[in-house]
Amino acid sequence: MGIPGGEILQLPTPDVEGVFLKRLNRFAGVALIGGRESYVHIHDPGRLRELLFPGAKIWARRTVRGRTEYYLAAVELDDELVLVDSSLHNKIAVWLIENGYLLRGYSLEKREPAFGRGRFDLLLKSPEGRRALVEIKGVTLEVGGRALFPDAPTSRGARHMEELARAVAEGYEAHVIFLVLRKRAESMSPHWEMDRKFAESLLRAHKAGVKIHAVKLEMFKWGLRFSSELPVDLSPRDF
């Protein structure tokens, strides 16, 4: 899983590998690292059940964060590395935009702009000079070639979709970028079974003019490469 040729976004290099043992709560778990049990900070609040199971191989960085000694960076499956450090999502999206893989010609105006009842991830300026709000979501769940978001209910995510629709009504451009971090994904869909409220909010936002993007990225040791844009299917479905 070394880095191949092509444009690469370099990632922070983990210090250690280990074996995941159990999750304690949304942001902490226990792993066997260097022959002893250690606390690991998990930045991604999703359930990650398909990745963080007892015995899973993980990669982590040393850190000082309360009781946790390590910061979870990635999970290594049989033939796939999966990034689980959601603190990097904004950096990844900016890299995609600045390198022309997505929203070509747009420029970064501000990070974490305030709008309505909260903040979004990015404020961009379009080639025509319009303001564009951007919300970024990382996707680590893949089932049968379909990337699904979310893997846990997210009332905050649904609220963001409603606010983006309102932004369009007030003259902004608005975009949702799904960063698909699973190499077998061939399409992207909201996870209707897991969080119908979010899925319905995303569908309404799309109908209101919010633009939806899904970008697949391949992870290597230790970098990411753009793979492709994926088709997005917003239609309701049963699983």
UniProtKB/Swiss-Prot annotation:
GO terms for molecular function: DNA binding. It comes from Pyrobaculum aerophilum (strain ATCC 51768 / DSM 7523 / JCM 9630 / CIP 104966 / NBRC 100827 / IM2). It comes from the Archaea. Gene3D superfamilies: 2.40.50.580, 3.40.1350.60. Pfam families: SfsA, SfsA_N. Belongs to the SfsA family. The lineage of its organism: Archaea, Thermoproteota, Thermoprotei, Thermoproteales, Thermoproteaceae. This is Sugar fermentation stimulation protein homolog. Transmembrane segments: none annotated. NCBIfam families: sfsA. The gene is sfsA. InterPro entries: SfsA, SfsA_C, SfsA_N. HAMAP family: SfsA.
